[in-house]
From Swiss-Prot:
Name of the protein described by the UniProt record: Formin-3
Compositionally skewed regions (Pro residues) per UniProt: 731-784
Known role: Involved in controlling polarized cell growth. Required for interphase actin cable formation and microtubule organization.
BP-aspect Gene Ontology terms: actin cytoskeleton organization; actin filament bundle assembly; actin filament bundle organization; establishment or maintenance of bipolar cell polarity; mitotic actomyosin contractile ring assembly; protein localization to mitotic actomyosin contractile ring; regulation of cell shape
Subunit-level organization: Interacts with rax2, rho3 and tea4. Interacts with tea1 in the presence of tea4.
Biased composition (Polar residues): 29-53, 438-457, 1445-1454
The family this protein is said to belong to: Belongs to the formin homology family.
Coiled coil feature spans: 540-639
Native organism: Schizosaccharomyces pombe (strain 972 / ATCC 24843) (Fission yeast)
Region listing for Disordered, in residue ranges: 1-67, 431-457, 683-811, 1268-1337, 1416-1461
Cellular location(s): Cytoplasm, Cell cortex; Cell tip
Keywords: Cell cycle, Cell division, Cell shape, Coiled coil, Cytoplasm
Amino acid sequence: MASKMPEGSPPTSRSIQSRNSSYSTSSNERIGTPSTISLSENSDLSKLQSTNDFESREDLSLTSDDNNDPEYVMCYNTVYHQKTKINDKLLSETEQLRKIYPLESRVFPKPTIVKEITNERTKRYTFYDDDAPLTNQHTVLDEATYNRILKRIDFFIEKVVEVPPTYHFLSLLNVQLRIQPIWWMDEFAERNGIESLLSALRNLGHYPERASKTPLESQIIQSLFHCLNSENCRRRYQSSAKCSVPGFNALGTIAETVLSKSLNSARMATFLLKFLCNKKGLSYFKAVIRAFEWLVEQKLSKTRFSAWMHSFNDVITGVRVCADSSPQAIVHMDEFEDTDCLIDYLVATLALIRDLCAAPPDLQLRCALRHELLSAGLQKAIDSLLKWRNRHVRDALQLLIKEHNADARRFRSGSDVNNVDRKCVKKQMNYREESHTPHGNTTRKTSTPVSNNRPTTPEQQAVWDVFQRIYTRFTGSEGSKESFIKLLEYFVTEPDNGKIQKSMQLLTHTLEALEGFKTAKADTNVGLTILSQRLLDKLGTAEEIAEYKTKYNGAMLENKHLKEQVESMLSQLNVGPRDPMQFLKKQLDELKAELNLRDNLLASMQREFETRYRAQIQAYNKLQSQMEHVQNSNEQHLQPGLLNKVSKSFDSVHRRNLSQDSLDAMTEQFSYHVEPNILSGSGIPVRVHTPSKTEDLDESFSGSEISSSPSPLLPDVSDTVEEQQKLLLKSPPPPPPAVIVPTPAPAPIPVPPPAPIMGGPPPPPPPPGVAGAGPPPPPPPPPAVSAGGSRYYAPAPQAEPEPKIDETSLTEEQKIQLEEARKQRKAADDAARAAIEKYTSIPSLRDLHKPTRPLKRVHWQRVDPLPGPNVFTKFCLNFDITAKVFIDNGLLDFLDEKFDNTPREDFVAVEISDQRSSLLPDTVEQNMAIILRSVSNMPVEDLVQKFLVEPDFLPASILYFDRASLASTNAYTDPFIPYSTDYTKKNPKEPTADVNSLSYFEKFFVLFVVNLRHYFQERMKALKFRSTLFGDLEILEVRMKEVIDTSDSIMEDKNFAEFFQVLLIIGNYFNEPYDRASAFSLYMIYRLETLRDSSSALTLMHYFDEIIRTRFPELLQAESTFKKIQSVSGYNIDAMVAGVDGAYDEFCDFQTSLKDGALSKCDQHHPDDKAYDILSEWLPEAKERIRNIKKLKTDMLTKLENTVKYLCEYDSIDKVRNSFFKNLNSFYEMYSIAKAENEERFEKEKRRIMSEDRDKLIRGRQKTSIVAKYRNKRELPEDSDDKQDTASKDKNSLETIDEKMEDASKIEGDAKTGDDNEMEDLDKMEDLEKPDYAEEKDPYITVMSELRSRIQNVPKRTVTVYSDEGVATLEPGAQGDDVVDKAKMILEKMEGHSQLLTSSANPDEEVLRAKLKAAERLQKPAIPRTRRKGHTEPKSAKSLLAELTNGSNASNLVENDRQKQ
């Protein structure tokens, strides 16, 4: 597919740095980018990081050096340096291509493109193939090759956006992205390659339909991943990530790939999301969140993260086992070095979760996001991963837990709230410092630094920040920490910025050199200390510092230019609304309008309530003044306890009147008054202070005058909104003061309290002098509103029993007053009930169905409709029928659920504990968790029983349990002895400890390993031998049979032997007599490839192939034998023999174990263990297979020995048998290459000869009579009417034909000869044809039809015709008429008949043959390409007829045809 690059040492960091620094920063040339890119770099897209010269193609780090975490080291050593094993053959080939063409050799500038270049092969790229990689050895690229490259890229993009795409083209694009240079990827991005890949991913559909297109999905996501090496592609990807319109979400399609059943695709999709989420700024974080919300829109997930976490848990627990990710049991499973991309996927997913939870600046939002992830399934995943002891998974998990717990503690303590307040205060202070110039420009005052030891200039501040980040990398050693502190303090006070920048460069280089260390060692710490102490001595000269400053300024300008490009690209993004700010402003205006509408509604409700409330307060104060005046002038004394009781009864009514309905009733009905001086009598005046909750609200009403007339209850209130808010926001009123108890009266009159009316107004006070008289109750407070907007009502208190009144002791006047008071109270009660029933009488569904939970409230404005029809009364619904529909269909329960107003409990941030204790070693428990993860949902007892009854259950576990040596290691089994059962004794004792107290895997280890420890290892070894023996023997058997068949073919194939004999004859011809040989060794046959001809163009193998192909074609049948040799050339004969012998030895050990080993003691086995029975039944079959394979091995070795001797290899037969097949195959490959090159060369030569002949024929043709006829056909004389009459009369006679032919011959003789250039004549002929096409059509057709009719009407006779194939007979026209014979043969030739040759007796045979050949040659060039097919034959027939017959007859025929027109 691609030629291999010249071998050489890999480039050094110095050469890469010099090469990178020489790149042009102009927009026309591409800037090379290394394979390592920082996914959290701070908006510096051109940052070059060549940290490792030997990095692979996929080395993309997940974090930058700025973070103080071990994830940077983890990325370099785990995530991408894991050996990926992909079963797909094409991907395996591209992995090899990636190793052959590493990224470092592809980071070179785009070659110069010129239109005209020289033919020097060193200055041009002439041999570019579509799939060949572009290398940096070519500095000049011709325009044609560059156009081919662009067309190839366009072709790939076309194939990508096809629906559905083709797997073959997607895989080819994947290969190109792995082997082509960076500027090739830049061209791919500029032609919308990234957008095309995202569209192709979208065109695959959604799950579960996409599940059938997993191979296509894998190729597309890999192509997107490999594009990240180009900076242009990264910018395009970042811009496209923000594309989220209805119906399409670019990142949403990638989020769907995270759910893919291919773990390799899910891994790369996670990396792509991680790449964006790690960028600074909330825009990319929001884009990733919208991608997960896209899953909810497509109904792939219930919540944003539930499907993702479910898939993540499936991978951890083994439910989702893929072809490219199934971890097989190996020897060192605890290191996880051979588990494909499983660890990559886990680490990348945990890193993506960390970035998602750390991106929001608001602590509450971060905690809410963490809570959502934990609820979606992250908690289960963490519990499972805590059992894993892989160092990379453990480090990533600990970082996640650490960040989660830190946010949880801050959320509970509320420390971040104070920080936010301080930031807000600081921002306001800075805002106040802004001053406006007279010209309107805003300037900001520069504040002095807080601390004097902090840097004051921006350069020093930048250096200080960098050094702080560097220092955090060396916190493991105290010595290096102290040294770096001193170094930092020195550089803060250093005035020379050049020295500081040079020191920073040295420290950064040291950090890059020490990246590979996992932990700080003693020698490393000492080296860092010495480096920090002697760093100033290693500073460069002033020239070096100036050079560094120049490079630094250039890099800053380049970064600025790239930032401007990013901003322009983002502003030109043609997705979504044209102006995002205008779109957001429109949404904000709509939200403000809705809020204003709600505010106006609340203000109107507040004003309405305020008006009623103040009116009631005024009425109450007036009534209170009246009652005080009456009581002061009253001569009778009331009983002290009655006023207190009446006051309490009024308070109860006050507590009940919390409904807005009662306020409406009181507005209309609460307008009664009390007449003073009704009763006469003497007594001690009593001043009663009624408890009022509104005294603090408005004290001006308490001093109002006493009026004997009713006072208006709705005075004009014109308070502002600000006063109303102050009124409502006042603190709650203080508790009422104590009631002044009057002196006891001589004749107390008990008065019954008012009847308890729910929601009604208070009853009017009785007349003075009557028991129970007192001030009216205060007005009700504002109605209480719950958190969700619905009102709650205070429960009605129990009514006190009405006290009995002895009316016999009352006077007549008192009885009248008591009766009047009762009437007034009854009227007030009736009015209150009417006001309440006005609304409660409206039918409601609550009368039929009681809500099961508190509901939210509908805030509408209630109106009293005027008399007459309206929208609610004209076409009134039947309430009973409508209510039945609601109840029968369950709509009320549905509404109860959807509009539930039950207060929600806020989530609580909890800490996750990673502490665990286990008797089982971490590595063993980790390995068992991986092996048993697909069956971990089964109970332990059932799982152990499954292993005992079905020994073949879970074959992967057999290999692990055989190699792990769990039962033979006392350190593993001794802690579990108290939990185990010993089956070696006849009466096994019960375990002393409870096995149920152990964890899942500990319990399994006890029941399956510890209980069977006396024969467990031999059992698992025998089961492993049984599971692998037949498969190994089958492979050996197939290979040995192929070797035997190939050996027989070599010895029996005659063509194979003669093939080499011809080669021997050619070699002896070349050699001198004393160098001749009767046989040659195959070991040295490769020398034929080095023997070239005199021109060094071809080898002997090329000429040998030409001889075999042309002179001995029957020897080509030996190719079937060579094909067999090619199939067995890769087999190692010694390895096959060793495999048979090893299988026999293992079988002997297995047989011994069954007879005399621990497996033979069945009485000491577990009672449910069926392993021995199954192995005993399998033993005879295994013995027979071993016997057959040993016999087959003997036959193979005998055949090989005879074949080696047959090929004249007599020395060291045991060594030669491993190589002679390879030598024969090498010879056949050389022969095949030479054969293919010969065929290609012959084909090119054939095309060249045909091209030369064609050119020579066109150039060498002379002018013919046909060209003259075509050119001069307009010059033919016009026929007279007599000739027309004669032609019409003689139409059916042969004599007329002869006359016409004679006239045609005369015209031929008078025709002009023309010039010597035939091509010019042909052009003129075509020009003459074009205007007269319509006029010439009918005459030619008339000539042909007339000729056919005349020939058919002539009597038949036989004519002998001689041809190359023999003698034939023809039946032309009349006897003796040779003209008819000639005409018919011409007609047959023009109509596609076979070529005929007339008899040699005919005197015109040679003339006719020559003229027919000339006509045939001229027929093709004379075809006008713009005319209809079939028009040429009639015109050629006319010309031939005029040439081959009498000229006069032909002229007459033409004239007659023209006259007919």
